[in-house]
């Protein structure tokens, strides 16, 4: 099997290392950012490529930015050349959002995982933590589920936030300065009209990246939009057969936005702006995670 072959190669390499028989010609000096250098040897894998978690493309400059499973941001050309690690000094595990936005002669990369949201205006030389999200470093049940950016570059976050009694509820934060400072606009609890107090696993948000429109909110069998006044406006119920694992995605049709919602293992579709929904059947057996 592949595991047996891999273990065999590892054992051979280890023996060569300890006996001093490892060919020194196999070593080479590598210069990496922060002016660090050293002798590096390939340690594997033998037949497995690395994978990325999410990516964004700068079409104007023919660049692609990728978040690797190892926790780094990489930049290369669209031809697949010149790959450079921009954040080798900090490992950010579980990145689920990466987006380049440009404004006022600034190029800003936004990077998010479940624990933090970072931004850099200098291609990763320095990373800054967004302000207003201190709760993420508190109780372990706090986490950042979703980041979306509107066509006019307003940033919204969906998070799970502790209530102080070992429970958490979904909350939505908003930034009007391109991700530098966030303000809470909604707590998704019974005071906001929700049927119960639940974590962000029972919610998701979506908006069009390329067209001006609303922020849409999925909550189990309920579908809303967020108005310009940061208030919830109910649209319709969804005929779901379960709850939890809420995932919402969509696009812009010729007359209305269309949506696909994943709730409790089933997939639902709306082609008329969320006014009515049909059950499209059970999801595939397994899927990676939100960004896939």
PLM features: residue spans?
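Extracellular glycan-interacting surfaces
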Residues: 1-292
């Amino acid at each position: 099997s592949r595991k047996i072959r891999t273990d065999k190669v590892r054992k051979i390499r280890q023996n060569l290392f300890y006996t001093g028989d490892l060919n020194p010609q196999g070593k080479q000096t590598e210069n990496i950012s922060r002016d660090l250098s050293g002798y590096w040897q390939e340690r594997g894998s033998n037949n497995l490529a690395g994978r990325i978690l999410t990516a964004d493309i700068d079409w104007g400059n023919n660049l692609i930015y990728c978040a690797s499973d190892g926790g780094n941001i990489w930049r290369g050309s669209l031809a697949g050349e010149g790959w450079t690690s921009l954040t080798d000094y900090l490992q950010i595990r579980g990145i689920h959002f990466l987006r380049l936005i440009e404004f006022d002669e600034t190029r800003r990369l936004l990077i998010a995982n479940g624990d933090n949201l970072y931004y850099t205006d200098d291609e990763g030389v320095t990373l800054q933590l967004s302000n207003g999200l201190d709760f993420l470093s508190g109780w372990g049940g706090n986490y950042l589920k979703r980041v979306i950016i509107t066509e006019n570059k307003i940033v919204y976050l969906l998070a799970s936030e502790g209530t102080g009694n070992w429970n958490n509820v979904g909350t939505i934060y908003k930034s009007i300065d391109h991700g530098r400072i966030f303000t809470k606009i909604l707590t998704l609890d019974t005071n906001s009209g929700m049927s119960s107090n639940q974590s962000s696993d029972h919610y998701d948000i979506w908006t069009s990246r390329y067209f001006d429109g609303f922020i849409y909110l999925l909550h189990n069998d309920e579908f809303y939009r967020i108005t310009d006044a940061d208030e919830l406006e109910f649209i319709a119920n969804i005929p779901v057969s379960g709850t939890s694992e809420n995932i919402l995605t969509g696009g812009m049709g010729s007359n209305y936005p269309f949506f696909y919602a994943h709730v409790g293992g089933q997939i639902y579709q709306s082609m008329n702006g969320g006014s009515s929904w049909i059950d499209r059947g059970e999801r595939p057996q397994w899927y990676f995670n939100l960004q896939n």
